[in-house]
Amino acid sequence: MALQPFQDEQLNYFKFVSIVLNEFPKALRQTFRSMWDNNFGHLPGFQPWDDSTAVRNMFLNAEGGRTKVPTNLSYEEWDCTALFQATIYARSFALPDSAGHYQTLSDLYVKPRKLAHGSFHVSVVSPGGNEAETFALAIDQLRLLRNLLCHSASAEIVKGTFDQYVQHTKDAFKALGVKTDPIDVIGGWSESEFPIKEICKLEQAMKEESRAYIEFLEGVSSDIDELRELLHAMKVANANKDDIARLEQKFNDLREAPSQDTPGENSVLTL
């Protein structure tokens, strides 16, 4: 029996899946490597990123010995979730705020913007020309696009929406100094360039991406429980009020994350 031809909206969906699952990790790895080399590569006791066990352990140590990033594996095996953790959520790249407290790039530059759920950054370029802010916004834009795909309740994307997603992606890539040529190539693919074998690969890869995403959210829930216990202990011990306030803010941020990121009942998690 002959297979039914793809509708344009279905083709757009698989193009976007291909961009997110194949091109996002490449862009994020390039960005992470650049961030590492610029911040640590020249420091005594560190080295430029060569993906060796030694340099991955350096990153682990810079994270305080604990991270959700699988540093036991080559960074070529890190998925989008791990790469977001290794960049905008990493302690390694934290910067001081106006009060001198070190915050992750996400806490410092993304959260203050208070984006509505389901929306995107209007611009990923820092208004003040701050490279760290630009990187944070561009990486977060890719995170928002990836999350949107995981939340999708349909395996179809209309042309106008697809064009918007592609433009957001290209803007983020340009801000990160990543070439956009592959995005243009995928965006121009025809149905004949999507053989059934490739569709099956994308479907399986989407399942794995969604599984990793859900595992991350489960980890966030576990972190919330740990923070709740720590916050209680600090209050009992009459800890410094500023420390308690910062911990309470972190607890509230984590508590809000699952409600914003958890896929809905009709989300396309298995295709």
Residue locations for each model-derived region?
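Extended alpha-helical heptad-repeat/coiled-coil "stalk" and oligomerization rods
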Residues: S192-T270
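Feature for intrinsically disordered/low-complexity regulatory segments and propeptides
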Residues: M1-L148, S152-Y213, L217-D223, L230
